[in-house]
Regions:
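Eukaryotic scaffold repeat domains enriched in small/polar residues
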Residues: 1-276
Length: 276
């Protein structure tokens, strides 16, 4: 399990809680921030390069030898053929240059230029350097199939693209991880509402949430208006960030203030060892 201690430093533990080593990723002077994905004894990630503003760069880090490459090998995503691309200029709410992509199979992906997208298929981890966020179509979310994107108009620095059937109210999944059987995701609705965009996504029309999609049963459980995965035990903190360990285990990460709150509210004798 890798726990972020600083922007470029991670503490590595085994599942018994034993400290193993400290992992140092590319320095803070190079990367303002990074989003890391651990799989197959490698760390994958990307970060904003300080001296180039919002330019993002992807890198791979082999564990535990520490061999770092400044960019990931580009592998074509499995069964994904691009049909068309639409660009949203200056969409600060999305972190800069933002694109929407329509694939031949009817699915849509969207994300920032060179953010580094990861897709697991056929036992391999695929990387694509253009689009990271995914618009999913799942049973239970009651979404209409996106047909085509077109330019709707501009407002200040924002340009707005929508589908023929209107993207407002649909789900955008900015974080997606899966363990082969389930997909864990956070989601937002109303992110294509222009009023919401210009108010930095703080309006009530933008609703966050999270959910779990069971690939085997095609069942979706969505928890709206809350980005935390609820813990089944009363009083226990909820998971707010999730990731996968290098050997495929699902790991929930908790906010520090929620851990402190749980320690204060749960009797010591009832607290699990990891909470103590």
């Amino acid at each position: 399990i890798y726990i972020r201690a600083a922007p470029s430093h991670y503490l590595c533990y085994d599942f018994e809680g034993k400290f193993l080593h400290t992992l140092t990723l590319p320095g803070e002077r190079t990367f303002l921030m990074g989003a890391h994905y651990f799989a197959n004894n490698k760390a994958y990630g990307y970060g904003n390069i300080l001296n180039e503003g919002a330019t993002n760069q992807a890198y791979a880090y082999r564990l535990p030898k520490g061999i770092c490459t400044d960019s990931l090998t580009l592998t074509e995503p499995a069964s994904k053929k691009i049909k068309g691309v639409a660009r949203m200029r200056g969409a600060e709410a999305y972190g800069g240059s933002f694109f929407m992509v329509e694939h031949e199979d009817g699915t849509w992906t969207a994300g920032n230029r060179m953010n580094g997208t990861y897709q697991s298929a056929n036992g391999k981890l695929y990387h694509k350097d253009l689009f990271c966020d995914t618009l999913y179509q799942m049973k239970g979310l009651h979404r209409e199939k996106a047909i085509a994107a077109f330019h709707l108009g501009s407002y200040g620095d924002y340009e707005r693209y929508e589908t023929v059937r209107n993207m407002e109210g649909k789900y955008l999944l900015p974080r997606v991880l899966h363990d082969g059987e389930r997909i864990y995701f956070t989601l937002f609705t109303g992110m294509y509402n222009m009023q919401s965009l210009t108010k930095k996504l703080q309006t009530k029309s933008v609703r966050p949430g999270c959910g779990i999609y069971n690939l085997r049963t095609d069942e979706v459980k969505v928890q709206k208006d809350d980005i935390y995965f609820k813990h089944p035990e009363e009083g226990m903190p909820n998971a707010c960030v999730y990731t996968l360990s290098t050997d495929g285990h699902w790991v929930a990460v908790y906010q520090a203030e929620r851990l402190v709150e749980a320690r204060e509210n749960i009797p010591t004798e009832k607290q699990p060892e990891w909470l103590k």
